[in-house]
Amino acid sequence: MLNAQQFLNQFSLEAPLDESLYPIIRDICQEVKVHGDKALKMYNLTFDHTKTDHLEISHEQIKAAFDTLDEKTKQALQQSYERIKAYQESIKQTNQQLEESVECYEIYHPLESVGIYVPGGKASYPSTVLMTATLAQVAGVENIVVVTPPQPNGVSQEVLAACYITQVNQVFQVGGAQSIAALTYGTETIPKVDKIVGPGNQFVAYAKKYLFGQVGIDQIAGPTEIALIIDDTADLDAIVYDVFAQAEHDELARTYVIGEDAQVLKDLESRIAKALPNVDRYDIVSKSIANQHYLIHASNFDEACHVMNTIAPEHASIQTVNPQPYIEKVKYVGALFIGHYSPEVIGDYVAGPSHVLPTNRTARFTNGLSVNDFLTRNTVIHLSKDTFEQIADSAQHIAHVEALYNHQQSILIRQS
């Protein structure tokens, strides 16, 4: 256990990306740009040990995955989809009916095409499809494309079922940096898209960073993280599994628990130690707990909030007797979960907001994915002659001050 000042003195995050990967990513992207599908099939064999004669999964296969899914899983995915859809519809920016006198305003248009990366790796993630494709669908994106790493037994049936529910247009079994390059450049089979979203490993994150500017991206994601503020009213057994739930994602997952009561933190520490040997996914959880788990003793409310805002975690959870004051004070987090019945895991699946959230302290300046990230926003300026005449002198004078005389002339010629 550390006191708040000790923690803050040593707190740092590793660079979110391993710079040594840069040459590898560059070479992969160039290979895909030049050789297209041939390169993708080669990388599937090299990295995923899977031979793929056909990169695209047919609509018949996608529908069959949904049709043959067990009813309980189907209902769970459907409920998640409905809640996500309803929430995103409620926050979607829309074009407003304007009075004729309004001369400056904004209009919104959906992106034309979006690529979604759905991780394979250590687990199957249909929730990633729901938390991304639903948003694109609500926005009105015309072409939604999913890429996901090939598996020896084929792409997860749950992932394909989620693609069916969200009306994804195309699904391709290709992953890693090569899939990001394919979505950026386009290949014989995979269409070029305008924006790529979705979480992935370091190769995926670095490819998104490398290709940003040629394609839009949501974020460059690092390891997942949660920070909790608790007091003596928190259910410590539940907190143990809030910690384990985050830790099981990745050996590098970070978990922080902040509290003003040192004894509560000690009790939690002993419960974690007792439960750890028998936890599912022990190999992953134990490494995360050993290397990336912190108990932090804060001296008061303000200090607890300061620690939370400094961490700026992807997920923040407040489980105290009176959580309301924290809602205003905790400012820099990806998502804020309040109370015993709002565990972070509910946000992973069915709460409604997307679980694609900023990591590595980027919550200090960016936000979680939403329907509005799949819209362009255009300003429209349509001035009357009267308004032009009221402001033209200022415009032409500023142009003169900046020595941009053709700018100035563009105004003057309209005044004459």
Curated annotation (Swiss-Prot):
Pfam families per UniProt: Histidinol_dh
GO molecular function: histidinol dehydrogenase activity; NAD binding; zinc ion binding
Entry keyword annotation includes Nucleotidyltransferase: no
Binding site for substrate: T224, Q246, H249, H315, D348, E402, H407
Substrates-to-products reaction catalysed: L-histidinol + 2 NAD(+) + H2O = L-histidine + 2 NADH + 3 H(+)
The keyword Cell membrane belongs to this UniProt entry's keyword annotation: no
Enzyme class (EC, first level): oxidoreductase
Any GO BP: L-histidine biosynthetic process
Keywords: Amino-acid biosynthesis, Histidine biosynthesis, Metal-binding, NAD, Oxidoreductase, Zinc
Co-factor note (free text): Binds 1 zinc ion per subunit.
Binding positions (NAD(+)): Y117, Q178, N201
EC number of the protein: 1.1.1.23
Essential cofactor(s): Zn(2+)
NCBIfam families attached to this UniProt entry: hisD, PRK13770.1
Function: Catalyzes the sequential NAD-dependent oxidations of L-histidinol to L-histidinaldehyde and then to L-histidine.
Name listed for the protein in its UniProt record: Histidinol dehydrogenase
Organism ancestry: Bacteria, Bacillati, Bacillota, Bacilli, Bacillales
